[in-house]
Curated annotation (Swiss-Prot):
InterPro entries: ConA-like_dom_sf (IPR013320), Galectin-like (IPR044156), Galectin_CRD (IPR001079). The lineage of its organism: Eukaryota, Metazoa, Chordata, Craniata, Vertebrata. SMART domains: Gal-bind_lectin, GLECT. Contains two homologous but distinct carbohydrate-binding domains. A beta-D-galactoside 2 binds at H267, R271, T281, W287, G288, S289, E290, E291, R292, S293. Residues 17-148, 227-355 form the Galectin domain. Binds galactosides. Has high affinity for the Forssman pentasaccharide. Ligand for HAVCR2/TIM3. Binding to HAVCR2 induces T-helper type 1 lymphocyte (Th1) death. Also stimulates bactericidal activity in infected macrophages by causing macrophage activation and IL1B secretion which restricts intracellular bacterial growth. Ligand for P4HB; the interaction retains P4HB at the cell surface of Th2 T helper cells, increasing disulfide reductase activity at the plasma membrane, altering the plasma membrane redox state and enhancing cell migration. This is Galectin-9. It comes from Bos taurus. A beta-D-galactoside 1 binds at N48, H61, R65, N75, W82, G83, T84, E85, E86, R87, K88. It is found in: Cytoplasm; Nucleus; Secreted. Signal peptide: none annotated. GO terms for biological process: immune system process; negative regulation of CD4-positive, alpha-beta T cell proliferation; negative regulation of type II interferon production; positive regulation of gene expression. Keywords: Cytoplasm, Immunity, Lectin, Nucleus, Repeat, Secreted.
């Protein structure tokens, strides 16, 4: 299926936040972050444009620091090692005040705009098409993260000229009280209707095409299960699969299978009666050893929406649930291009698929 969807914005994401950039970055893509710096609670925040959900490979680390008069550090991390810092001895952000931060991808560098004004340009140190995730940490409250392909929308400015003649500032947080900012829900407690906006309805801008093969997006509001579709070209390192839906109130289990012919290379099987997320591989009709360990509790809940992102790496699958990295599953079938079918079934309502 030809690619032609749009990546929905992240609305009121909770910090620390890590989310996927569907298809990876390309020349002409723009990411716009709307938020506010908290009045207190720390001296720094950071925006990382990175590969995957871990922080060992960060193509662009943008790190405002409210220290020594205020400055911004820009850097790149490769295989866990930081490069040479670039410091901008000017602070365009104010504590307690709102901001618009825009990253525009150009062939030679990132163009960074703050509140409609050019702040800096950061030359690429690694190929930008490897970037498929965005991570934000520190003393910020976020309203939205939106995505746009300005090459596909030439009538719109590269970065919106938002006038901040009167800064919108946040009151200091009362001492002894920690509350979520208005409109922000804790993990796994967002209303289903809110998630449906993210998974079914498109947002302004264009989804980013995959650097190798454009992903197929199936925007049907409801799918019949079991759902089965091909993965054009099969899997390869950096290829990602996105599956979103809502778990039925009386659900017992559901599954996501990545198949190679009659074999199942990766079987992801949340089981509510066992409070477990089972992973396995089936070869020639025989199942291997199950993997069940999780770094934290059950990430799926009856009656609630979910989003599963499966990133294929050279040695494993990396799996994130609701923008939180969950586990890695090492390949047992290692012929990745032969893994070319996706199957989804069980006690869910399926609302969004991207292969």
């Amino acid at each position: 299926m030809a690619f032609g969807g749009a990546q929905a914005s992240y609305i009121n994401p909770v910090v620390p936040f890590t989310g996927m950039i569907q298809g990876g970055l390309q020349d002409g893509h723009k990411i716009t972050i709307i938020g506010a710096v908290l009045p207190s609670g720390g001296n720094r925040f950071a925006v990382n444009l990175q590969t995957g959900y871990n922080d060992s490979d960060i193509a662009f680390h943008f790190n405002p620091r409210f220290e020594e008069g205020g400055y911004v550090v820009c850097n790149t991390k490769q295989r866990g090692s930081w490069g040479t810092e670039e410091r901008k001895m000017h602070m365009p952000f104010q504590r307690g005040c709102s901001f618009e931060l825009c990253f525009q991808v150009q062939s030679s560098d990132f163009r960074v705009m703050v509140n409609g004004n050019l702040f800096t340009q950061y030359a690429h140190r690694v190929p930008f098409h490897r970037i498929d995730a965005i991570s934000i940490t520190g003393v910020v409250q976020l309203s939205s993260i939106s995505f746009q392909n300005i090459r596909a929308a030439p009538k719109q400015p590269a970065c919106s000229k938002v006038q901040f003649s009167q800064a919108v500032c946040l009151p200091p947080r009362p001492r002894g009280r920690k509350s979520n900012p208005p409109g922000i829900w804790p993990a796994n407690s967002a209303p289903i209707a809110q998630t449906f906006v993210h998974t079914i309805h498109s947002a302004p801008g264009q989804m980013f095409p995959n650097p190798v093969i454009p992903p197929a997006v199936y925007p049907n509001p409801v799918y019949q299960l079991p759902f089965f579709t091909s993965i054009l070209g099969g899997l390869y390192p950096s290829k990602s699969i996105l599956v979103s839906g809502t778990i039925l109130p009386s659900a017992q289990r559901f599954y996501i299978n990545l198949r190679s012919g009659s074999d199942i290379a990766f079987h992801l099987n949340p089981r509510f009666n066992e409070n477990a997320v089972v992973r396995n591989t089936q070869i020639n009709g025989s199942w291997g050893s199950e993997e069940r360990s999780l770094p934290r509790g059950m990430p799926f809940f009856r009656g609630q929406s979910f989003s599963v992102w499966i990133m294929c790496e050279g040695h494993c699958f990396k799996v994130a649930v609701d923008s939180q990295h969950l586990f890695e599953y090492h390949h047992r079938l290692k012929n990745l291009p032969a893994i070319n079918n996706l199957e989804v079934g069980g006690d869910i309502q399926l609302t969004h698929v991207q292969t």
